[in-house]
Amino acid sequence: MPDKTRILVTNCNTTVAMTEEICAGARAAAGPGTEIVGLTPFWGPESAEGWVDSYLSAAAVLDLLRDVDEPFDALVMAGFGEHGREGARELLDVPVVDITEAAAHLACLLGRRYGVVTTLERSCGQIEDSLLTAGVAQHCAAVVATGLGVLELADEARALAAITAAGARARQAGAEVLVLGCAGMTRLVRTVASDLGMPVVDGVAAAVKLAESLVGLGLSTSRVGSYAKPLAKQRQWGLPPTTSQGCQGPARA
């Protein structure tokens, strides 16, 4: 294991304040020899809520990662239920830990069934699909929406009330452990656990600790089969090139 472990943490949206909040949670969980470096995509949605946002976010994060020129030992992807983790594993030669997967795996060590509390109802399907792909969906009792958008979580009192109510519904559905299904909920983990009287797993903290463990064990993504390096070919990244007439292509909203 290196003397100092450097972990990149990528926000899935363009809101810098949320990146800072995520990194504060990551640093609180990290060991004394770990440096946390936060990254915010240059383009994409201000908050990821729904399929369009998720796919746009994934492309923006991959576009960001391909140009990182500073050394790092692992990547934490801080978008709960968002797309892109498989692409990042192809792209990078270091361990890639997604907060959705990390939280679910740790929750399975603490109880037989876990529940997820998330933001809007429209995000539940994405989270269910992500858990299924990760192989941990069979232990999920429920994915429950709070009804709050990602940016609305900044109102701490309102967020706490909504998360606690959703957590109680997940417990009634059979959850023995609760997973916070948005990186913007990180700061509330201890209060929610106390209010509900059950273990609560924060995905950011879980992902950081798993990333540290993988680095310490000298393990990284397998290149056999699924996550082989991308094929060599021409790819057009980011914005479209200027046309031969010197004009940009059509504007996009």
Predicted features by range, described:
Residues 32, 91-94, 110, 139, ...:
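Short, structured coil segments at secondary-structure junctions
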Residues 58-112, 116:
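Glycine/small-residue-rich loop that forms an oxyanion/phosphate-binding "nest" at active or ligand-binding sites
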Residues 5-29:
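N-terminal beta1-alpha1 ligand-phosphate binding loop
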